[in-house]
């Protein structure tokens, strides 16, 4: 009902839906965790703590009572709001069953080879130390590379490199500034590499090692109410953001292994958001392109650049791919020019050609923006609402952001709804058939199944059937 919030404290529920003011969790227990509370709760309910014979609850017990009461009492009002907003079906058919799917996935966890993770960390440490020495030699000074202030003084003060932007706290050493310098100054590229490796080590080599539990598995928390578009997110740790763009990043995936007797089997929705765009826009040319072409990016390049399919170059395909995915996110000519390192005029020409090729897509995206302005929100195919308050802003940049949100949210949100439906169907089928195999990870459009080897063919069938029937799209 309010997807722009990422926390839903009981005192907020009481205020917003029950017209009540109650003490907050912070008021009652401060910074204590619920683990601390449970350990303190007195189990002797027969003990009388006051003269009138009634029990006196401690602050932890009061907090739990308020949580239970506000959840129970606000149910009727929240259900009414779901009906009023047309999201009752979404809530009861998708989100509520998903609680069980996510619980089963969190309970299963994913196995990690601790020794390989430690070896990976040692490898990173060695490379980081080597880079440190090379950076000291390249700059002619020993300093704290992790200090933006010291790094800025060395690069732009001492070495007098170009593009120095002085701020109140010193020179900016943001990635976009350093990336401009890297092609001409090898030491700057080493600094960028150093940053990547130190992040890999702290976040993954060290971070993952700290959360491996006694069963040898990592049990992440999967959240269904954090993102505004309805996407599932992962925290403690984030297993949806394992890097894949650099070789050392990809190596981290090798520490995740199936249990003995099991194998990993994954299935994803290929280009799900583009397929959703084709379906929701109803653009017949784009729908036909998906039905006929194995490579939608080559076909788009052929149509946008008006050349035969067999003559499409790798560069033209890459540019068409950037346009295809950029359109989904409401990309501007400036944004596309930055992505492809071309002029803004060329980028605008690419976008215009795309819309000339798929005119119903342009009409659909424009319609989404107009609906967002009129109603204050946009909706997914399944009725999920995404408020877009930025569309009414007096600030041009805010309004432009709002337009991109209005164009993208129904597409990304619909894709998120589809993968949730697929998760529910797959999880339910695996359990109904009494299989040992289980979902261990969901990464946006992909499901990873820890599959008992003897069930491999069965699980392949389950994934294929249940994911295909999650939604009825004009392009499958």
Residue positions per predicted region:
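C-terminal structured "cap/appendage" subdomains that terminate the fold
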Residues: 426-476
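Conserved catalytic alpha/beta cores of large enzymes that bind or transform nucleotide phosphates
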Residues: 253-277, 288-321
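Hydrophobic, well-ordered secondary-structure elements that form the walls
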Residues: 147, 230, 268, 301, ...
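Conserved catalytic core of nucleic-acid polymerases
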Residues: 47-53, 107, 219-220, 224-227, ...
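Conserved beta-strand -> loop -> alpha-helix junction used to position metal-binding or nucleic-acid-contacting
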Residues: 1-3, 9-12, 293-297
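Conserved, non-catalytic sequence blocks in retroelement Pol enzymes and Pol-derived host proteins
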Residues: 3, 145, 267, 289-291, ...
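Conserved "right-hand" nucleotidyltransferase catalytic core of DNA-directed polymerases
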Residues: 5, 9, 13, 29-250, ...
């Amino acid at each position: 009902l309010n997807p722009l919030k990422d926390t839903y404290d009981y005192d907020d529920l009481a205020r917003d839906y029950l017209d009540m003011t109650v003490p907050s969790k912070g008021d009652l227990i401060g910074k204590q965790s619920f683990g601390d509370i449970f350990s303190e709760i007195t189990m002797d309910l027969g003990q009388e703590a006051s003269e009138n014979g009634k029990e006196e609850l401690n602050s932890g017990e009061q907090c739990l009572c308020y949580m239970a009461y506000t959840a129970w009492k606000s149910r009727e009002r929240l259900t009414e709001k779901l009906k009023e907003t047309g999201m009752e079906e979404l809530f009861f058919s998708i989100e509520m069953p998903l609680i069980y799917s996510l619980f089963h996935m969190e309970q299963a966890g994913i196995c990690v080879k601790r020794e390989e993770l430690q070896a990976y960390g040692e490898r990173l440490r060695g490379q980081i130390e080597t880079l440190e020495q090379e950076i000291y030699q390249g700059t002619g000074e020993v300093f704290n590379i992790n200090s933006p202030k010291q790094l800025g003084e060395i690069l732009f003060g001492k070495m007098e490199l170009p593009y120095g932007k002085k701020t109140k706290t010193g020179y900016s050493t943001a990635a976009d500034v350093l990336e401009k310098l890297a092609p001409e100054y090898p030491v700057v590229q080493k600094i960028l590499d150093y940053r990547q490796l130190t992040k890999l080590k702290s976040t993954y080599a060290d971070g993952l090692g700290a959360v491996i539990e006694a069963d040898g598995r990592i049990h992440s928390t999967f959240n269904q109410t954090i993102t505004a578009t309805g996407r599932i997110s992962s925290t403690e740790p984030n297993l949806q953001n394992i890097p894949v763009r650099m070789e050392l990043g990809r190596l981290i995936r090798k520490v995740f292994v199936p249990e003995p007797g099991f194998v990993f089997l994954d299935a994803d929705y290929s280009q799900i958001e583009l397929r959703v765009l084709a379906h929701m826009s109803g653009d017949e040319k784009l729908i036909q392109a998906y039905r006929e072409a194995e490579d939608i990016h080559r076909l788009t390049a052929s149509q946008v650049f008006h050349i035969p399919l067999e003559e499409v170059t790798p560069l033209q395909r890459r540019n068409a791919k950037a346009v295809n995915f950029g359109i989904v996110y409401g990309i501007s000519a400036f944004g596309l020019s930055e992505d492809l390192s071309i002029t803004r005029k060329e980028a605008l020409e690419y976008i215009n050609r795309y819309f000339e090729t798929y005119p119903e897509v342009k009409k659909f995206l424009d319609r989404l923006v107009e609906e967002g302005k009129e109603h204050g929100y946009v909706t997914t195919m399944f009725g999920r609402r995404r408020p877009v308050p930025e569309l009414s802003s007096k600030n041009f940049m805010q309004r432009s952001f709002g337009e991109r949100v209005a164009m993208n949210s129904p597409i990304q949100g619909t894709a998120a709804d589809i993968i949730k439906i697929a998760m529910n169907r797959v999880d339910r089928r695996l359990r109904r058939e009494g299989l040992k195999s289980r979902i261990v990870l969901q990464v946006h459009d992909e499901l990873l199944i820890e599959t008992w080897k003897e069930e491999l063919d069965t699980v392949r069938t389950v994934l294929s059937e249940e994911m295909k029937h999650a939604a009825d799209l004009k392009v499958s």
